[in-house]
Swiss-Prot record:
Keywords: ATP synthesis, Cell inner membrane, Cell membrane, CF(1), Hydrogen ion transport, Ion transport, Membrane, Transport. F(1)F(0) ATP synthase produces ATP from ADP in the presence of a proton or sodium gradient. F-type ATPases consist of two structural domains, F(1) containing the extramembraneous catalytic core and F(0) containing the membrane proton channel, linked together by a central stalk and a peripheral stalk. During catalysis, ATP synthesis in the catalytic domain of F(1) is coupled via a rotary mechanism of the central stalk subunits to proton translocation. This protein is part of the stalk that links CF(0) to CF(1). It either transmits conformational changes from CF(0) to CF(1) or is implicated in proton conduction. F-type ATPases have 2 components, F(1) - the catalytic core - and F(0) - the membrane proton channel. F(1) has five subunits: alpha(3), beta(3), gamma(1), delta(1), epsilon(1). F(0) has three main subunits: a(1), b(2) and c(10-14). The alpha and beta chains form an alternating ring which encloses part of the gamma chain. F(1) is attached to F(0) by a central stalk formed by the gamma and epsilon chains, while a peripheral stalk is formed by the delta and b chains. It comes from Shewanella denitrificans (strain OS217 / ATCC BAA-1090 / DSM 15013). One of its GO terms (molecular function) is proton-transporting ATP synthase activity, rotational mechanism. It is found in: Cell inner membrane. This is ATP synthase subunit delta. The keyword DNA-binding does not apply. Gene3D superfamilies: N-terminal domain of the delta subunit of the F1F0-ATP synthase. The keyword Cell membrane applies. Belongs to the ATPase delta chain family. HAMAP family: ATP_synth_delta_bact. Disulfide bonds: none annotated. Its main location: membrane.
Length: 177
């Protein structure tokens, strides 16, 4: 994974810089996300790693993407195809999203709770995280009944485990040591 990120970073950075210059960050994020989904498609994967000529591969990929990818996005796809790097398009999209979130002072937070959170509870969690992180927070909420009660919050490098199962695991570790 680290190798894919290393390969994808210059493409993501170049695309992000271009998007900033042209005031098109959101449209580029959508375009790269769509292209990444195409590259991850099971019928497309063998073509990306096969021996297809770069020009034909780029033309095929662009035709599959259709109007979802603009001229500049097509140019990125052509350059990546010429360099044999289309298989890292998902990593490019992921890095681009990270650059966009950093630029917009946003962070995506994953909240896993034992029961479904009400919209009021989600709002409280969001406000608390925004204060703590000094960023706008976008919550992705899910449920996991194995937590027993409480929640686990992941936002970037921050992990807050307030679940009962987590507390029991920590207590068990302390008792065993």
């Amino acid at each position: 994974m680290a190798e894919l990120t290393t390969i994808a970073r210059p493409y993501a950075k170049a695309a992000f810089d271009f998007a900033i210059e042209n005031n098109a960050v959101d449209s580029w994020a959508e375009m790269l996300n769509f292209a990444a989904l195409v590259s991850e498609n099971e019928s497309m994967k063998p073509l990306l790693t096969g021996g297809l000529a770069s020009g034909k591969l780029a033309a095929l990929f662009i035709s599959v993407c259709g109007e979802q990818v603009n001229t500049q996005g097509q140019n990125l796809i052509k350059v990546m195809a010429e360099n044999g790097r289309l298989e890292v398009l998902a990593a490019v999209s992921e890095l681009f999203t990270g650059y966009r979130n950093e630029w917009a002072k946003e962070v995506e937070a994953s909240v896993v709770s034992a029961i479904e959170l009400s919209s009021e509870q989600q709002q409280q969690v969001s406000v608390s995280l925004e204060k703590r992180l000094a960023r706008k927070v976008k919550l992705n909420c899910s449920t996991d009944t194995t937590l027993i009660a409480g929640m686990i919050i992941r936002a970037g490098d921050l992990v807050i485990d307030g679940s009962v199962s987590g507390q029991l695991a920590r207590l068990s570790d302390k008792l065993q040591s």
